[in-house]
UniProtKB/Swiss-Prot annotation:
Gene name of the encoded protein: ureF
Function per UniProt: Required for maturation of urease via the functional incorporation of the urease nickel metallocenter.
UniProt entry keywords in alphabetical sequence: Chaperone, Cytoplasm, Nickel insertion
Compartments, record wording: Cytoplasm
UniProt family annotation: Belongs to the UreF family.
Listed Pfam families: UreF
Name by which UniProt lists this protein: Urease accessory protein UreF
One MF term in the entry's GO annotations: nickel cation binding
Length: 226
């Protein structure tokens, strides 16, 4: 990996990226309300399960294949699979989440003129755009390798989930860092599994997450938008 590639991926995975990731918990807050999360250990287990059982089978392999489509500039496949991913979101708030963050990142890519003009034109035609489609556009624009892209995305997801845990459980900073350290190996395993997953085996089935997210939409008191 080159220094340029590393810096670009650190930028994309940064919580300072202005796409609003901090405002979403992706079901974590609803799981807390349902008493599935009570402390640091159950928070770690919840995040680990989301990474291993959900992201590794769905979002991460989807990222790998969208990245390849951006490199090939297969506009029809990009739009078709982007629509499939949005349709696979289990609740209205999860759909709004990926659409809002995807739109924000696509706008940033356009404003910073990342990528060539032809691919930027394709990016502009995909609406609504899911976050993984916009993320892989940005990664392809910086010539990042698939394993590094998936690792950056997975780490950013784990970090955001941990941040939600710090605010909602609540947990201390050291407890949060212990969660991140504990999941390093799981990130590596999730990336390897995702890279070995063919397009027709991408699976976003997560019924518990869908039910919790739907409940969260009418939850009385909440900090997060999902």
């Amino acid at each position: 990996m080159t220094t340029t590639e590393l810096v670009a991926l650190l930028h994309l995975a940064s919580p300072a990226l202005p796409i609003g990731a901090f405002s979403y918990s992706q079901g974590f807050e609803a799981a807390l309300d349902a008493n599935l999360i009570r402390d640091a250990d159950t928070a770690r287990d919840w995040i680990a399960s989301g990474l291993t059982d959900v992201l590794a089978h769905g979002e991460l392999p989807f990222l790998a294949h969208q990245l390849a489509r951006w490199h090939a500039h297969d506009a029809d496949a990009l739009a078709r699979e982007n629509a499939w991913f949005i349709a696979s979101r289990e609740s209205a708030e999860l759909r709004r989440e990926t659409e809002q963050m995807g739109w924000s990142l696509a706008q940033l890519c356009t404003s910073l003129e990342w990528g060539d003009a032809a691919r930027r034109a394709t990016l502009a035609t995909i609406s609504p755009i899911a976050l993984p489609t916009a993320f892989t556009y940005a990664a392809a624009a910086h010539d990042a390798s698939a394993d590094a892209v998936l690792a950056a995305y997975a780490f950013g997801w784990v970090e955001n989930q941990t941040s939600a845990a710090l605010k909602a459980v609540p947990l201390g900073q050291l407890a949060g860092q212990r969660i991140i350290v504990a999941l390093r190996g799981a990130i590596d395993a999730a990336v390897r599994r995702a890279l070995a997953t063919p397009p027709d085996a991408v699976n976003t089935f997560a019924p518990q997450l869908g039910i919790l997210s739907a409940r969260h939409e009418t939850q009385y008191s909440r900090l997060f938008r999902s």
